[in-house]
Amino acid sequence: MAAPDCTTNESRDWARRPGGMLFWWVLPILIGASTYVLNLSFAADAFIWAGAFAWMGTGCLLNARRCARLHCFISGPALWLGAIAAALVGSGIISGPHALSNVVSITIVLAMLSCVPEMIWGRYARQD
C-alpha cells in the first residue's frame, strides 16, 4: 500500500499560492484596513468590514472543500460570524463605543488562532 500523497492537497490549497492568498485574504484585509484612513461613516466602515470578512470566510470555506485545509474549516465559519456581527454593528443592532473595533479584533484573533490545530494535527484534515 502506497503512502498518502500530500501534493494533491497542497496543489489545491489557495493559501499556499501567492495569487490565491492575495485575492482571498490579503486584498479584503487591505480594503477593511483602508476604512481607518478613508474617513467614511461608521456604518460604511462596518459594512466594508462585513464584506471583507464574508469574502475571506467564503475563501476559507471553498478552500476547505478544495483541499481540506484544517484551519479553513475553523476560520471560515469564524469569519462569517464576524461578517454577521459587523453587519449588525453597521445596522445599529449591536452598539457601543468600541463595538466595531471589538468585532474586527475578535474576528481576526479567532482566524489567527484557527492555525493552532494545524500545529497539532497537521495542515490537512484528510490526505487525498
Residue ranges and their predicted role:
Residues 110-128:
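Membrane-water interface at the C-terminal end of transmembrane alpha helices
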Residues 85-105:
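Membrane-helix boundary connector in multi-pass membrane proteins
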Residues 70-80:
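Cytoplasmic-side transmembrane-helix entry/capping segments in multi-pass membrane proteins
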Residues 31-33, 81-89:
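Aromatic-anchored segments of alpha-helical transmembrane domains
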Residues 41-54, 76, 101-109:
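Structural signature of hydrophobic alpha-helical transmembrane segments
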Residues 52-68:
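Canonical alpha-helical transmembrane segments
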Residues 1-14:
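Short, Lys/Arg-rich, polar N-terminal cytosolic tail immediately upstream
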Residues 12-44:
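Membrane-helix boundary elements
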